[in-house]
Amino acid sequence: MGELFRSEEMTLAQLFLQSEAAYCCVSELGELGMVQFRDLNPDVNVFQRKFVNEVRRCEEMDRKLRFVEKEIKKANIPTVDTGENPEVPFPRDMIDLEATFEKLENELKEINTNQEALKKNFLELTELKHILRRTQQFFDEMEDPNLLEESSALMEGSEGGRGAPLRLGFVAGVISRERIPTFERMLWRVCRGNVFLRKAEIEDPLEDPATGDQVHKSVFIIFFQGDQLKNRVKKICEGFRASLYPCPETPQERKEMLAGVNSRIDDLQMVLNQTEDHRQRVLQAASKTMRVWFIKVRKMKAIYHTLNLCNIDVTQKCLIAEVWCPVSDLDSIQFALRRGTERSGSTVPSILNRMQTKQTPPTFNKTNKFTSGFQNIVDAYGIGNYREINPAPYTIITFPFLFAVMFGDMGHGVLMTCAALYLVIRESRLLAQKSDNEMFNMVFAGRYIILLMGIFSIYTGIIYNDCFSKSLNMFGSGWSVRPMFSPKGANWSFETLDGNAVLQLDPAVPGVFNGPYPLGIDPIWNVATNKLTFLNSFKMKMSVVLGVIHMLFGVSLSLFNHLYFKKPLNIFLGFIPEIVFMSSLFGYLVLLVFYKWTAYDAFTSKDAPSLLIHFINMCLFNYNDPTNKPLYRGQMGIQVLLVLIALACVPCMLIVKTMVLRRQHLWKKHLSQKREETPAENLEQSLEQTGVSSSCTGLTQQGTQKFGGVRVGNGPTEDEAGIMDHDQLSQHSEEGDEHSEEEPFDFGDVAVHQAIHTIEYCLGCISNTASYLRLWALSLAHAQLSEVLWTMVMHLGLSSRSWGGFFGLSIIFAAFATLTVAILLIMEGLSAFLHALRLHWVEFQNKFYTGQGFKFVPFSFESILEGRLDE
């Protein structure tokens, strides 16, 4: 199996980076995105690491940029995105960036502070202007003799007349419009009705300088008598957050004051406009480089985070890092390190040393925009073990095909294909838009999955001969009614047609059935009353056939895993019993289906036995049923043999494998005791004689040295020793039988594990086969929904014969199209998608796919900037 069908071969490597070149080397590795750094300081607190101060400085710069970005969005200024990917700035450039951001932040804060103060002053002057205008109207109204009676109660002991209102005190102010009713009630109750309130709404909304919101306010003036009422009124105004302003008592003073306020408002408006223009210029200039600044800062922050994962030499001149990387990309990584060293100006080259380890490497499957969606489907179930067979390449075909078996409709498939083609053709433009809609992004990410699902749905729709619940008669039906009227046939007549609501064609009559339809199902079945009987039988058998083939393919893939990981025990006591067990029972059932289809024709079909009864009798060893005739000679002997073979496979998987594992453990234990008794000088000779290779021999021959406080091996080179051979890395205990010598062996645990696996597989073969019947059930449901929608909606418009039928048909077609998309494409499509997902995760992948690995997460600027990784 090539690299396409397995994860990439990985290696653990050690990087020796000079302190002055480490920053640039990590920067180049981030641009490459092919190494995953390991944390060599797991016990060191995050705040006690070497580059924590640099990380904090980057976070502070990021905070300032977010503040500027917030101001840009508040001003509705678009951010320029040229798609440029700037290089990472050097560490010495951080000071310049900090100074730039500090200056920009302070300038914006100063502008905002001044602007807020100016707006607050402008608001106060505007409110005072409205007060002066409205109070003059109030006083003019108070001069009206008709209103004197209303205020007479406030002037106890007065003589009345024109000068009476001037004896009253008053306050004027502005309050939010929604608080007026409560404010008025409070004044009435607290002052016991001894105040006189006049109010008027300000027509234009006023801008709140603190929030920038538009607020509706009202002007009020309160007349009262006495200092006690005055204090009460002011406290109430203060409680309701009303703004009080001084208002002259004489009309002349009010007029002069209004003129002065208008003049100040004009001057203030001019200053506000200039301030806003300056603010816009600053923000527009910042918006042009905002994205570039963000990229630079976040790249720097990511680099320093990564450097904190490294170990530092005691001389402070070298950084040591450990990384997982694909073997196929080692040359690219070496080249990136060389570029980083040259950029930094260092004369000492960076060193990449491949290490030998027993740790399980991460799983890395290379994908492109086409295969990434299918790989995500597999990874959602579980990340594959290292170098395990990857189901994604097979899923590219099997997933949309099984979906189409359930969804099969030519018309719906065309609609789905067109929608996916739109996303594929315009993918560059849609990617550039960077939509925040999660639902759209999810659909867009699976555009190639949807495209294949649509194409396969067209194919299965052709096989089913189903287009919006109607059949297409492209080649002419293979059935004919005319021979039934002949004397050699059923001797039908027109009276026969009139006297029978339902008549059945006899394919045994010559000329009635002229052979199968060239492509798909004969369209005559679309008008037959026994359509469901025929289609249900066909689709049910087809589901079982496809399911058994799919599962057998999954079991067959496990063979390649056992061969690759060199586990002959799993082949002879795992794969072979599993494939034989399934083939003996369900593979035989598939052969019976094809045999019955080919062995019985129109003349003998009435004598065809039931496969279901045959299969049940086969498992129960019941061959005395006279109602169910045998299919072929010697059927009893063959079926008994197959059942016995299947039953023999169960103890082979359950008991034999467990005993062999125990025997292997005892043999290893015997060898280890023999090693302890054998003198050290004869150990290697005895190992050579027994053919057992010591994994530690190479290590004992290799010396070690101290390199900056870190113990580093100085063993042979890659060519001499083949360091990090993929076979050594790929060793993992898939079935619990490949344990190292140090691992304890518990016979009870192994027996229980093997019993669970055997029972799960045997019962799973039965339940999984039945589970594939969902292909038939979903296909039937989709076809029936499509037919109901056509009959209940579209048929009404097409059957109209009136002059308004065209307009009615237009409305009905719109409803039909909406329901088709909403119910059949989206809801039914999602249902079929989920069922296909289950068939792959449970019925297919559990035959060979462990899915207990961990994903390769490389240090990549692209992933960090797209938000796929935490910074």
Question: Where is each model-derived feature located?
Answer:
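Conserved, carboxylate-rich catalytic/transport cores that coordinate ions
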Residues: 2-11, 18-34, 182, 292, ...
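Long, charged N-terminal accessory/stalk domains
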Residues: 1-395, 399, 410, 423, ...
